[in-house]
Amino acid sequence: MSELLSVALFLASVLIYAWKAGRNTWWFAATLTVLGLFVILNITLYASDYFTGDGINDAVLYTLTNSLTGAGVGKYILPGIGIALALVAVFGALGWILRRRRHHPHHVGYSLLALLLALGSVDASPAFRQITELVKSQMRDGDPDFAVYYKEPAKTIPHPKLNLVYIYGESLERTYFDNDAFPNLTPELGALKNEGLDFSHTMQLPGTDYTIAGMVASQCGIPLFAPFEGNASASVSSFFPQNICLGDILKNSGYQNYFVQGANLRFAGKDVFLKSHGFDHLYGAEELKTVVADPSYRNDWGFYDDTVLDEAWKKFEALSRSGQRFSLFTLTVDTHHPDGFISRTCNRKRYDYDGKPNQSFSAVSCSQENIAEFINKIKASPWFKDTVIVVSSDHLAMNNTAWKYLNKQDRNNLFFILRGDKPQQETLAVKRNTMDNGATVLDILGGDNFIGLGRSSLSGQSLSEVFLNVKEKVLAMKPDIIRLWNFPKEIKDFTVDRDKNMIAFSGSHFRLPLLLRVSDKRVEPLPESEYSAPLRFQLADFAPRDNFVWIDRCYKMAQLWAPALALSTDWCVSQGQLGGQQTVQHVDKAQWQGKTAFKDTMIDMERYKGNVDTLKIVDNDIRYKADSFIFNVAGAPEEVKQFSGISRPESWGRWSNAQLGDEVKIEYKAPLPKKFDLVITAKAFGDNANRPIPVRVGNEEQTLVLGHDVSTITLHFNNPTDANTLVIAPPAPVSTNEGNILGHSPRKLGIGMVEIKVVNVEG
């Protein structure tokens, strides 16, 4: 309703100003500004919906205050360009319409009415309401009801008798199981759902709307609110250290806790969270690649669901035979947005909707078949009678190719339970949320019926029942939940552990690299993750007088304040203010002790602007002084004009990537010498090994042969045509996720370059 009202007010404002207000520069500027704000808000809402499927939420607020550079958003570049172009077009059209009758006399009354209507349209817009509520949640000091409803469970289950299998289905919300809306989409898993305790109204709350957040909510009974973006949790060394979560209780009760997934465990700090709360046995992409039958059978995120669930079954079988009490948690990935992935073993590889194939629905149909097969193996085993099986979505589906069809339905998360000891077939329509999942499981296992803010849906009352405005209530509790992290409020002395890549201060530990914003009685950690901006881009958003401590590889800060360290991959510590003084210190000991020393100096805005501009230089445009191209640092030597076909720096060097160019091309500013040696230190990937690799300069071509290990080869070139471009053409680029950033499309790797040096041998 508010959406229609805001649009009506917007149109009324435009029409009244365009046809009645007449000409006045001030009123025109004011009205255009407010109407433009309305447009920006609604385009932001649309764009946010595209990424999150949930409007302008906590993750969007974080992104709006941090650079997107370096984030894994390649699949969304075209939509982003489209939104930007639409914004320019709408602004241009709006300005043209408002100035249609600019030659008519000015009328104050109509101008004022148009401005008031424009303000009303902004106030009534859902986007403005969502942003207002989020900003309020950042500024609140907490909610008195938090202390009333937050409850710590007992640390043990008195007499545990049942093993637990807990399956998180990636984005596998209950809406997919509506057979009227999506006929025959989930027949196998849907049939199992109908055999058990099916909770039909599991809503999604703020702070529970992405994978790690859904896991925290379901095991600890709290939303994932933190003083940093949730998917950057990999940088912390402990996760809600004061909380008692389901895994802690299980471990204290004699359970061996296992977790199996196909993606890298470190993404979003899943490994940190699970290790912090009772899980001693973790298996992700790195751990599974040495045990699975086909290590190359992977999608953009990791191993396919059929592979993961096959390994989970092997674990279940072995643990059941051992006779020890255990829990086995697993997380699928094939239904990840925006398209999903189809495993090769499922029968349901295609699902048509509206008369055409839909990739997301197809992925859902395939994945549910794999999950059902895993469950049926357990049910057919002699150990099912001692087992509780839980199936839940980690969160609602984000904007995938099925999202617009899902939004036409009443959307809820999936949560159902199959009890081997006591079969129960019932659909429970009680209002609940993801935070209630762990408490419900704990209740069935014989423990308490509460964890944190979660309550058992079998014997307790969910916050979703207590509060009609439960979403707003949870946001009001955000400061209380952030305080559970027990983050330090000051930093004076700190220790950098060079070998463990950690920093410790005020009793807390963080993984490196790390950026800290330091103010009175507050230290704000800004970690770096696959989906957050590089730290230098985050630092560029600091105000001129903001105090910072930045711990990162030396070469990343050297271009600003320490040119002598431009090629160093050691750790360095920089601190100061962007508009004042900065220092850079080289970490030259295994245990390096540091102190903060912020000086209250005069702020120089020219210096500030220069620092910000330098911080924002993209990697490929960085230049350093060196007599060779060093590939494990960003940028290139000063002599290089541009280069292409080369992937990002890694600790050892860089791969060629045919996705970025069929050949490696390095163009120098000046012609290469008439006669020179080309010294190449490199290795080959896959089928490129032990094959001739053409290397060209002008009209002359040499061949390079590399093995899988790094070696140094010298090629002799004549350059009579004064060519300035070096070209290397790997013969068989291999499409692979090896070393890839999680969630990104595969790279096409050819050779791995460590160093290339041009040695002049003229005369």
From Swiss-Prot:
What is the E.C. number?
A: 2.7.8.20
Domain of life of the source: Bacteria
Q: Which GO biological process categories is it annotated with?
A: glucan biosynthetic process
Protein name listed in UniProt:
Phosphoglycerol transferase I
Keyword Ribosomal protein in record: no
Q: Where in the cell is it found?
A: Cell inner membrane
The record's section on CDD domains has:
LTA_synthase (cd16015)
Family, according to the entry, reads as follows: Belongs to the OpgB family.
Q: What class of enzyme is it?
A: transferase
The source organism is: Salmonella agona (strain SL483)
Task: State any single GO MF term.
Answer: phosphatidylglycerol-membrane-oligosaccharide glycerophosphotransferase activity
Q: In which pathway does it act?
A: Glycan metabolism; osmoregulated periplasmic glucan (OPG) biosynthesis
Principal location listed in the UniProt entry: membrane
